[in-house]
Amino acid sequence: KVAPTNGVYFGPYLRYTNMDIERGIWLGSILLVTDAPQPPTIHIHQSIDLSPNPRQLKPVAIATHQRWTFYRYDIDLKMEESGPAKWTYAITSHLGCTRYEFLVAGRHETNWRFIATSGNDFALNVSANDRQKLGGVGYMWKDIMQKHAEIGGFHCQLGLGGQIFADRMWKEIPLLKQWLQMRGKEARKNAPWTAAHEEEVKHAYFHYYTSHFDQPYLREAWAQIPYISQVDDHDM
């Protein structure tokens, strides 16, 4: 069963998109994935503002999978002339409100603090027992979040390839296992790709990504450290 930890949505995933150097504008977005009839509302304000007049972000539906809808909330923030600033966004759904904070560099700041990660999943040959002994996927992200708090925040994280190892689908999806068992290259080459194949593979990807990024510490990191990501063969 695919279900988010908070019972309402997967995410948030806070993305750094770019910055408008001429105007001093930080550009990003927040992604939420939900099966609720209405998208959650998101308000954003500068953290230091003790009597905030938060701005509401507009949800845009960008994709669907079965009963789930992907909503993107675009962000544009004025970068401060005096230096870095922390911003808070609050997500409100029928189950309540959750707040997250992130760091935006000053307009003239050049010493951004980055982290880069890759290979953030376990290979197929690592047993569940060994994964547990190593602290699971979240062990590294716990360390990252501790460092994030100690230094006053990372400005951005670079998600390199191997955020998940989707190789597992060849062992877990019956239709793909059947294809691998076909004798002869020509037979495999000429095998039809059916609607059933499409749906099973799409749902596997959906499950792999949503469950992976919904794990403790990893979930918090991707909500509070703006990311830029790329993929490699493992992610696909």
Can you say where each PLM-predicted feature lies in the sequence?
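Extended recognition/assembly regions associated with phosphoester-bond processing machinery
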Residues: K1-M236
